Amino acid sequence: MENLSNRSYPPGAGVLTIVHGQKELATMAVALARSIRLRDPDLPLAVVTNFDPALFEGMFDYVIPWDFSRWTYFDAKLDMYAMSPFETTIFLDADILVYRSLADVFICFEGDDFGVVGHNVKDLGWFASMDLIRREFPSDTYCYFNGGIYFFRRSEVAAAIFERAMSIYERYDELKVYRHTSCKAEQRILCLAMVEAGIKARRPGSGRGYLIDAFWPTGCRIEKDVLSGICVQTKLGRMRGERVFLHFVGVLKSSYGYLFESLRLKWAFRYGRRGRDVDFILRIYALFLWRKNIPGFIVERGRTSVKQIKSRIRQMLGRGSD
């Protein structure tokens, strides 16, 4: 278990996430907040959204309304600097669950004004013409990273990166930048702004050696327990590292693993009970949701959703409902 007494954050630090477009992301953002609160109860959290603030009641310190009409979807993150109420910000996608204290992430970016976690490579598949990119943005390497996590401080350097990214964004098609699922992708633009600022990606590890990586660990086995703070990846029977968080991208949002962990978080925060009997019941319910492809816990956060879960569990126990 992690020693929570070692947690430390920069002054004015907080965590930011964005929820728009898909309403199920509201419930995922709440699951994200719960996973953070388990280990960082005093770290301020903010959500920027165009949904009803009541969906986030009690879990976020700031619920910030925002107009997303100019954005296709992912590219709304180019507004992160303007959105954040914090002096030092960790941005996390709503479909992430956190397994360790985020103090490790602050350690990773200590001294930085802006940062991402990934790899510095010579060629990127994000652009139709690397020759064009090299002419416009000459560099030996380019940052390859997943946009599930960003770090930035309120500073001239970070402000300049986001300002430059906005101007590059206007040339998205001219620069022959590929879209992601028909939407413009912010990390492909921020990558180019980082080149001009001379900023490289951090490797997936912090000062204490934990993996900070928003890419899903393909080909690895993951042992995870969000309530106990366990997230270990192994490959061919060998431990490859302990992860600070997992990013349930794409179809992983509706996977059994995500459903089960989210249900456990909801149950623990609402009822404070845990144990093998509860886990067994929640495993059955998560399997039911996954097999039916009806993520019922996503439909609506609040009393209705919890009552549905409670009623379903009672039915499975043969106790009827009340």
Task: Identify the residue ranges that each predicted region occupies.
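N-proximal low-complexity "stem/linker" segments adjacent to membrane-targeting elements
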Residues: M1-T27
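Short, hydrophobic beta-strand segments that form beta-sheet elements in well-ordered domains
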Residues: D42-F51
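GT-A fold catalytic core of metal-dependent nucleotide-sugar glycosyltransferases
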Residues: Y73-W126
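Conserved hydrophobic/aromatic beta-strand scaffold that supports enzyme active sites
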Residues: M80, I149-F151, F245
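Short, acidic, metal-binding catalytic loop of nucleotide-sugar glycosyltransferases
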Residues: S35-L43
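A glycosyltransferase accessory/donor-loop signature
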Residues: E2-G12, A159-D322
